[in-house]
Swiss-Prot record:
The active site is at D67 (proton acceptor). Homodimer. Its EC number is 3.1.26.11. The gene is rnz. This is Ribonuclease Z. Keywords: Endonuclease, Hydrolase, Metal-binding, Nuclease, tRNA processing, Zinc. SUPFAM superfamilies: Metallo-hydrolase/oxidoreductase (SSF56281).
Length: 308
């Protein structure tokens, strides 16, 4: 599991930072990539990475401001042109379906793959046997969502030595036992699979928030997350501007991280007024309150290790 930042700027493209897009690489977990937001030129940013558009499985849109969605039509079309034929689902606020349908229609773009668009409300918006995604609305003046990506716990290690003591040899029965099922052996003995499996491996939690002021929903979504990705559009001294424009300061992002008990905070969505040394000052402001904070730049990559 890896977070790869494709765009870390705010509002409009800048020389140092493109507009918002984050890739959650789940290659080991499901052979796929999930995108969070798709600002202008996201597909161009992808060209500088190892991401393959045909492997993009889901796209989660936080809100409908242009710096978070204007890259969608081009990426969708190019994915088809480059031979992508696997289904793709886009999750986003009400209005995202109209935006996509109109963009593709007026440009005569024909997709060769199945595209599903889901207009979301608060609650569980995605779930399968491995992952769960929960959405909550934030505070941004227009509907803006944060996403809590939960990897479900994995079964514990099969205690092979313990099975061999009972004379149970490797075979299909091992899979049944690893799933914790009750199994009857050839000699009639009944064993409880749970007695032969180690403790479950705790899944990881990644919280990615859209644009927002400080709000309780941010804290709830980030509760005990392994990683919190939070916007830091403004410095602490510009907190009045942050409030007026429905954004957060780096210090407010750190406050959310501390209250939520997260392990790691990554700052993104940085205004172009803070370039070079000034952006490092945002990082230092956050670290005074939450030391395990990092500042994302375009193409920054962060590995999220499994819990021990």
């Amino acid at each position: 599991m890896e977070l790869l930042f494709l765009g870390t700027g705010a509002g409009v493209p800048a020389k140092e930072r493109n507009v918002s897009s984050i890739a959650l690489q789940l290659l080991e977990e499901r052979g796929a990539t999930w995108l969070f937001d798709c600002g202008e030129a996201t597909q161009h940013q992808i060209l500088h990475t190892s991401i393959r558009p045909r492997r993009i499985e889901n796209i989660f849109i936080t809100h409908l401001h242009g710096d978070h969605i204007f890259g969608l039509p081009g990426l969708l079309g190019s994915r088809s042109f480059q031979g992508g034929d696997t289904p793709l689902t886009i999750y986003g606020p009400k209005g995202i379906q109209a935006f996509i349908e109109i963009s593709l229609s007026v440009s005569y773009t024909r997709l060769k793959y199945d595209l599903q668009v889901v207009e979301i409300e608060e609650g569980t918006i995605f779930e399968d046997e491995r992952f769960l995604v929960i959405a909550k609305q934030l505070d941004h003046g227009i509907p803006s969502y944060g996403f809590r990506v939960v990897e479900k716990d994995l079964p514990g290690t099969l205690l092979v030595d313990k099975l061999k003591v009972l004379g149970i040899r490797p075979g299909p029965i091992y899979q049944q036992i690893k799933l914790g099922k009750t199994v009857q052996l050839d000699n009639g003995t009944v064993i409880d699979g749970r007695d032969f499996v180690g403790p479950p491996q705790k899944g990881r939690i990644v919280t990615i928030l859209g644009d927002t002021r400080y709000c309780e929903a941010s804290v709830e979504l980030a509760k005990e997350a392994d990683v919190l990705v939070h916007e830091a559009t403004f410095a602490a001294e510009d907190s009045a501007l942050a409030h007026d424009y429905f954004h957060s300061t780096a210090v407010q992002a750190a406050e959310v991280a501390k209250l939520a008990g997260v392990k790691r905070l990554i700052l993104t969505h940085i205004s172009s007024r803070y370039q070079g040394v000034l952006s490092e000052e945002l990082l230092e402001q956050a670290r005074k309150l939450f030391p395990n904070t990092e500042l994302a730049s375009d193409f920054s990559s962060f590995i999220i290790p499994r819990k021990k």
